[in-house]
């Protein structure tokens, strides 16, 4: 179980971990014993707590075997029990990995990384997990530091090329929208323009999911690794000149593990 494999890392980050299920206590104990789970599993027969959190799945036919299965996801609570973050997917087959959650909330250490530099900036790119299974959601992160006097463009009301982490399409990969940090407004005096830019070091994050649909899962089952490729694309300017758009390749290889169907 992926969470058990990351339990030590979660504890190291000062966080605890519990899981709640509608299963009976004896069912959860059997499940935990068979998989060596050491963090607490809480039984919620009748789904009373699950319903209070609005996680009871009543969107399917009551006669379906999936009726009542909770919407799978993760809540991050503070010490007062207040929810400060939540991570949920539309499809029950898809899940955030623990490392993706940790990286999203600013905790944890990337599992794999690479560096690159150009005349305009330096970049350290990393991936949350180097081992994953179909259905798991991973984070690709680009920590970008513009060179002195340089800026690159944030999304906004302009026609310059926005800095972006573009990923090559694969039939077994779902690419999620990029997450951008806050930008600055820069006054480009030669044209008297005010545009959205990044001048200081910043982080881009783009999540991807290894698809668990039957066609994708079948394709992934014949592979031992999955390579995710793409590039950091940007246009940089200084206070006088805008340079040609530039593309910095990135590549990460993820070792594949099979789905646990027990």
Which stretches of residues belong to each language-model region?
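Thiol-/selenol-based redox modules, centered on thioredoxin-like
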Residues: 63-124
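Short, basic/aromatic recognition patches
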Residues: 54-64
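Sec-exported extracytoplasmic/periplasmic mature domains
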Residues: 8-12, 33, 54-55, 82, ...
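Solvent-exposed coil/turn segments that connect beta secondary-structure elements
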Residues: 23, 46-47, 80, 170, ...
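Extracellular/lumen-exposed scaffold segments
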Residues: 102-262
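Structural microenvironment flanking redox-active thiols in thiol-disulfide oxidoreductases
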Residues: 1-49
